[in-house]
C-alpha cells in the first residue's frame, strides 16, 4: 500500500512497519537521510492549482513530478516546516504554508516527525533553493523529490488561505499548466481523502517496546504504558520515553494483547482523517472504550 511511490532507503513512503526500528536507535530512526545522487528528477516549469469551486492559481512547479491532488488545507507556522511535512496528521491533504519563505534553514537530521512525507502535495509562496544553515543536509524540494511528493510555488498563498477559510473543506489538484484539461477531469472524479483509511496508512502493524528496562535517575523501573498509534509523531514518543517504558501499539490491538504487556495506562495519539471512519480509527475507539471499561487509565493528545 504505497502513497507516494518508491524512494531511497531512509525515506520509505507509504505504509510502514515501524516495529522493525531498533528501540535503542529510535532517535536516529527519524533522521531524514537521502542520497542526492539518486533523487528523482525535479519538477519544473509553469504549474496551475485548480480548486473544486472553480478557483485557479498559476505558479511554478518544484519537488517531484506528477499531480498533487487532495483536500486543500493550510498551516500558519513560521518555522517547523520539516516537522509539518513529516507529520502523519497531514496524510492525504494538500498542505499550504502561509509563511512566504519555506526552506530557509534547509532539512536536518533528527528533526522529522516520522519516516515519510505525508501530504500529497505542497503549496508555498517561495521554496528556498539555497538554505543558510551549517547543519542542513538538503532542500525542501529534495525532500519532496525523495518522497515522490509534488509542490507548487510562486502562488498567492494569502488568497488561497482566505479562500479555504471561507469555503472550509475544498478539493484541489495541481500540476503542469499544459495539462489543465486533464486535471479538470481528474478533479471532477476526485473523492475526499476522508473516505480512505488514513490511520491504517500511517500507523504501525506490530507492537514494539521502545525503551525496554527503562529506569529513572534512582535506578527504579519506569511505569509501562501503551501508546496507541493513530498517526503518532516521533516527538511525542520521545517525550513519553523520558517518563515511561513505552509499548508502541497499532490502533487495532486487542485488550488481551495489551494486558499481556502489563501496561499501567494507555495513551492515544492524534492522527489523520475522520475518527468515525469504519477502519482502524474505529478499531482504536473500540480499544479505548474497552480500556476505559476495564478501568485502565487513558490519556490522549490533540
Predicted regions and their residues:
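Short, Gly/Pro- and small/polar-rich lid/capping loops
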Residues: 2-4, 14, 18-63
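Flexible inter-domain linker/hinge segments
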Residues: 28, 43-44, 164, 170-224, ...
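Proline-centered loop/turn at the N-terminus of a beta-strand
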Residues: 150, 224, 297-299
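Feature captures the catalytic cores and cofactor-binding loops of soluble hydro-lyases/lyases
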Residues: 36, 42-44, 50-182
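Flexible gly/pro-rich beta->alpha loop and the following alpha-helix that scaffold active-site loops
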Residues: 233-300
Amino acid at each position: 500500500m504505497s502513497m507516494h511511490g518508491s524512494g531511497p532507503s531512509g525515506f520509505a513512503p507509504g505504509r510502514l512497519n515501524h516495529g522493525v526500528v531498533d528501540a535503542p536507535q529510535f532517535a536516529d530512526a527519524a533522521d531524514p537521510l537521502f542520497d542526492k545522487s539518486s533523487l528523482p528528477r525535479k519538477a519544473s516549469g509553469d504549474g496551475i492549482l485548480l480548486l473544486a469551486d472553480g478557483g485557479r492559481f498559476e505558479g511554478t512547479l518544484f519537488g517531484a513530478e506528477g499531480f498533487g491532488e487532495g483536500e486543500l488545507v493550510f498551516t500558519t507556522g513560521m518555522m517547523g516546516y520539516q516537522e509539518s511535512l513529516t507529520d502523519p496528521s497531514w496524510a492525504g491533504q494538500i498542505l499550504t504554508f502561509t509563511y512566504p519563505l519555506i526552506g530557509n534553514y534547509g532539512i536536518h537530521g533528527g528533526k522529522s516527525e516520522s519516516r515519510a512525507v505525508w501530504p500529497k502535495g505542497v503549496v508555498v509562496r517561495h521554496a528556498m533553493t539555497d538554505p543558510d544553515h551549517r547543519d542542513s543536509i538538503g532542500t525542501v524540494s529534495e525532500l519532496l523529490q525523495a518522497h515522490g511528493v509534488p509542490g507548487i510555488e510562486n502562488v498567492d498563498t494569502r488568497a488561497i488561505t482566505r479562500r479555504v477559510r471561507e469555503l472550509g473543506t475544498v478539493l484541489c489538484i495541481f500540476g503542469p499548466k499544459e495539462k489543465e484539461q486533464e486535471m479538470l477531469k481528474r478533479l471532477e472524479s476526485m473523492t475526499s481523502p476522508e473516505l480512505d483509511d488514513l490511520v491504517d496508512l500511517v500507523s504501525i502493524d506490530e507492537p514494539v517496546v521502545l525503551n525496554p528496562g527503562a529506569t529513572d535517575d534512582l535506578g527504579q523501573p519506569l511505569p509501562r504504558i501503551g501508546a496507541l498509534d493513530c498517526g503518532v509523531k516521533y516527538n511525542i514518543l520521545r517525550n513519553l520515553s523520558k517518563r515511561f517504558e513505552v509499548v508502541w501499539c497499532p490502533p487495532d490491538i486487542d485488550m488481551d494483547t495489551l494486558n499481556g504487556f502489563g501496561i499501567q495506562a494507555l495513551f492515544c495519539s492524534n492522527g489523520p482523517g475522520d475518527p468515525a471512519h469504519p477502519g482502524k480509527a474505529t478499531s482504536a475507539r473500540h480499544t479505548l472504550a474497552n480500556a476505559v471499561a476495564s478501568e485502565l487509565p487513558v490519556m490522549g493528545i490533540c
